[in-house]
Amino acid sequence: MRKKFVAGNWKMNKDLLGAVSLATEILQLLGDEAPTCEVAIAPTFLCQQAVFQVIDESAIKLAAQNCFYEDQGAYTGEISAAMLRNSGCEYVILGHSERRQYFNETDEIVNKKVKNALSVELDVIMCVGETLEQRESGVTKSVVETQVRGGLKDLTAEDMKSVVIAYEPVWAIGTGKTATPEQAQEVHAFIRGIVKDMFGEEVANELRIQYGGSVKTSNAKELFGMPDIDGGLIGGASLNAEDFVEIIKSAE
C-alpha cells in the first residue's frame, strides 16, 4: 500500500517572517496527532533554515524547489544537493514546468540533477507534464513518456525507492483549470506503465505519483481517490495554512 504524499511548493512567495508564520500555522492546525500521509513543504532557499527550525522534530519534512547538478564549484547563484541535504532537506523538486519554461531546463539537465541529488541521499520529486497546446494536439502521452524516460535515464531499481514523480499538466498550473480525476488518472496509470517497462512491476507498484495542477480543497479528495494518484504537489493552495491542512486531510 503506497503512502499518500502531499507536498507544498511555495515557489517565490513568502519572505522570512511570512514563511515562519505559515509553517507555524500549518503545524498548529495539524495539531499533536501526526498525519497518516507524508507531508513536505518547500520554501525559498532564503527561508529554508528558519522554516526548518519550526518544523524540526515534527511530521513535516523540508523540501527544496531546485538544485544544481554539481556538488560545488564556480557556479554563481546555484545551490547543490549536498548543501541542501546538510541543511536538513529531505526532498528536492526537480524539472518543474516553470524551470523548464523560464530557465530552459531539458530532460538531460533534469536527469543530471536527479542523479546528483540521489548520490547525496536527497529524495527527488521529479515533475513531468504537457502544455495545453500539446494536449490539444493529442501528444500528451508521447511528451510525458519522453520526460519520464529522459529524467530517469540510467537510474537503478534501488534509486527509484527515493524518487516520486509529480504529474503536473502545465495548462492546469495556476490557471484555475484542473484535469478531471479521470484525465489525471489516465496519465498517472500511463506513467506507472512506463516505469514498469523501465524498472519492473515491483518498482512501478511502489512508485508514488503525485498530481499537481490547481489542486484545491474542493477537488483534492476526488483526485486523491483515484487508484494511481498518490497525493499532490500543491502550489497556490499551500500558501494558505487552512487550505493546505484540509488538502492534507483529504489524503488521509
Swiss-Prot record:
Main location: cytoplasm
Enzyme class: isomerase
TM region positions: none
Cited CDD domains: TIM
Pfam families in alphabetical order: TIM
Metabolic or biological pathway, per its Swiss-Prot or TrEMBL entry: Carbohydrate biosynthesis; gluconeogenesis; Carbohydrate degradation; glycolysis; D-glyceraldehyde 3-phosphate from glycerone phosphate: step 1/1
Subcellular location: Cytoplasm
Binding site for substrate: N9, W10, K11, G174, S214, G235, G236
PROSITE patterns: TIM_1, TIM_2
Assembly mode: Homodimer.
Protein's UniProt name: Triosephosphate isomerase
